[in-house]
Amino acid sequence: MARYRCCRSQSRSRCRRRRRRCRTRRRRCCRRRRRRVCCRRYTVVRCRRR
């Protein structure tokens, strides 16, 4: 569905959604509960941990 961009220059507390994919594969954004949280060294599947 909607894609979220990497939180490279953004704060990890919020992630803005964008149509383009993340530039880095290590950083991905996932949705935690109802809020969107950026993951640093975790994939979307393992985004439950900070």
Swiss-Prot record:
Name the tissues where it is expressed. Answer: Testis.
Give GO BP annotations, semicolon-separated. chromosome condensation; sperm DNA condensation
Supply the alphabetized keyword list: Chromosome, Developmental protein, Differentiation, DNA condensation, DNA-binding, Nucleosome core, Nucleus, Spermatogenesis
GO cellular component terms, alphabetically, are:
nucleosome; nucleus
DNA-binding listed as a keyword: yes
InterPro entries reported in the protein's UniProt record: Protamine_P1 (IPR000221)
State its location(s): Nucleus; Chromosome
Role summary: Protamines substitute for histones in the chromatin of sperm during the haploid phase of spermatogenesis. They compact sperm DNA into a highly condensed, stable and inactive complex.
Instruction: Give the UniProt family note.
Output: Belongs to the protamine P1 family.
| Protein name listed in UniProt | Sperm protamine P1
> Which species?
Chilonatalus micropus
Question: What phylogenetic lineage does the species belong to?
Answer: Eukaryota, Metazoa, Chordata, Craniata, Vertebrata
Q: What is the gene called? A: PRM1
